[in-house]
Amino acid sequence: MTKRSLPPAPAAAQGVTIVLASGRPTAGITPLAKELGLDKKGGCILAYNGGKIVDCATGEALYQKQLAPEFVPQLCKFAAAQDVAILTYDDRGIVCERDGDEWARKECVTTKLEMYHVDDLASYVDYPICKMLITVDPARRDAVCEAGKAQFEGRIDLYPSSPFFIEAVPLGVAKDVSLGALLDRMGLTRENLMACGDGLNDRSMIEFAGVGVAMQNAEDAVKQVADYVTAADNNHDGVAEAIEKFILQ
């Protein structure tokens, strides 16, 4: 998002609720929510690709789905067999056995959170988590993801969210599902929803929304389900373009 996209006051003044929907953990989205003033004006954080929704003003968890504990060691074993890194999050930031891994470090850049080394991630995680993240060389992403889907089919969901990330989340967790739950809570329907995005993990909510907007830099699979593709990308006012076209007119 850019400075032109950041001030949501005109949209908020029209009764629009801003929801920041991301694969990031809650702590990785909170700084942007505060920059937007959502902690004062109201709004929501949708974290972990839909695993959790938090009210920015109250801190209340409005919706939450967690990975069953037995999947943590299973996913760690799978990652080791594939020779890739896997990580999750605690109150401090990111936790990972391969804290120096090139692809794992990209999650630090994405979330602006610190990474902490643990000797045995499966033993360390003795608390509820919403997701684990497999990080992988882009050349191997699809093969690793397909292997994971085959191993965990019908038990948890695995899907790519970037060229080097594979999300591991509870079965059925996705941005469209959690947004649907939030809309129900608010007494609204998907026709009242505009969703903007560029990543593969945005595809479901863009297809679900009454107005689905893909950024110019979005992957083709995302553009295919969008109602509108912006002229600008997400780093050059693409979100602002959508807000001005569909909300502020």
Regions found by a protein language model. Name each.
Residues 1, 167-249:
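Mg2+-dependent phosphoryl-transfer enzymes with acidic/Ser/Thr/Gly-rich catalytic loops
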Residues 6-103:
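Active-site phosphate-binding/coordination module
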Residues 15-19, 43, 131, 191-192, ...:
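Short active-site oxyanion
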Residues 25, 49-50, 91-92, 164, ...:
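A generic "binding-loop/recognition-motif" signal
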Residues 29-33, 144, 148, 206, ...:
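Hydrophobic packing residues within well-ordered alpha-helices of enzyme cores
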Residues 35-39, 63-64, 103-107, 175-176, ...:
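Short, hinge-like loop/turn segments at secondary-structure boundaries
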Residues 36, 41, 49, 152-154, ...:
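Short, structured coil segments at secondary-structure junctions
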Residues 78, 82-196, 202-204:
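Conserved acidic, metal-coordinating active-site core of Asp-based
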